[in-house]
A protein has these predicted regions:
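Catalytic glycan-binding domains that act on GlcNAc-containing polysaccharides
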Residues: 23-198
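Short, Lys/Arg-rich N-terminal segment immediately upstream of the first membrane anchor
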Residues: 1-6
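Hydrophobic membrane-insertion alpha-helices, especially the h-region
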Residues: 7-25
């Protein structure tokens, strides 16, 4: 083998190794992002978001922060993908005139009721951050904050950085960060995704 040919093979091997590292890094980054920002239930999300005139990526962000797409998730009083309390679910069921037995831990019920409730809050507050704060901390707390100049300049919009509950402030920030990720990422097969976490 000539020295020139050996040099060519060495250069080709180095080039292929670099390409492999770049491609592997991109795939590794994609896997890391999908671990940090999973998606599931795309068909249900797009369906119920559409029924309630919501951005499906906002709904994905709420689910991500509330339950990380784990349908069995529960806190001390909230259950399911969208972490509804029994009281909220009962209000939604009555307002929607639901006549069947429902399980708020069921993914479809959770997404259906959660989207309906989120739309209700957006209609009331006419501001997504304020609606998200109400979704997390309750309407009573948000109404109190809106009437206090420390938390709202106009009585309509909360100053997110001044929300007095650290959990709620963090919640609004996390939902917005997740929403930004989901709406700027290509999910070509979102409608076909019926529950598989990717």
């Amino acid at each position: 083998m000539s020295k020139l040919f050996k040099a060519f093979l060495a250069a080709a091997a180095i080039t292929l190794a670099i390409i492999g590292v770049v491609v592997g890094t991109r795939e590794g980054m994609d896997i890391a992002q999908r671990t940090k920002y999973p998606i599931a239930y795309g068909g249900l999300i797009t369906h119920y978001a559409g029924e309630n005139d919501l951005d499906p990526f906002l709904v994905m962000a709420v689910i991500h922060v509330e339950s990380n797409f784990i349908p069995e998730a529960q806190s001390h009083v909230a259950y399911g993908l969208m972490q509804l309390t029994y009281e909220t679910a009962e209000w939604v069921a009555n307002d929607m005139k639901v006549t069947y037995d429902y399980d708020i831990a069921d993914p479809e019920t959770s997404i259906n009721f959660g989207c309906y409730y989120l739309r209700h809050l957006i209609n009331i507050y006419e501001n997504i951050d304020t609606a998200l704060a109400a979704y997390n901390a309750g309407m009573g707390n948000v109404n109190s904050w809106l009437s206090d100049k420390q938390y709202s300049d106009d009585g309509v919009t909360l100053k997110v950085q001044n929300i007095p509950f650290p959990e709620t402030r963090s919640y609004v920030e996390k939902v917005n960060a997740s929403w930004e990720y989901y709406r700027t990422t290509d999910f070509a097969d979102l409608d076909e995704d019926r529950g598989k976490i990717r």
